[in-house]
């Protein structure tokens, strides 16, 4: 499981780790101090040879995709959180992905999550409406 931050509490992160697959995540702005001390602000994970960057806040909307493509030249995808607005977009070499939120949609039209299938070095993203 890849998580773009805002676990909010150590307890929730521990619950995720107890019930599911391994959790790879980054801290978010709403996370309690203990999480901010233990989780990185960004990280790159590799799944079947595919490099995926994780970060919470991808910066302002204007030119976001171009900034991320330049920053993560060696990655095939970036998964970010913070906005709670789903995004599945291909920009140059990079998938720019935001799963939205299964719990707090804020300005997004729906609750959502993202399923990434990685096979033979290729990513197939699927936005799932909840």
Label every PLM stretch briefly:
Residues 39, 47-48, 70-74, 90, ...:
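Binuclear metal-dependent phosphoesterase catalytic core
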Residues 1-6, 24-29, 53-56, 77-82, ...:
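Active-site neighborhood of phospho(di)ester-bond hydrolases with catalytic His/Asp-centered motifs
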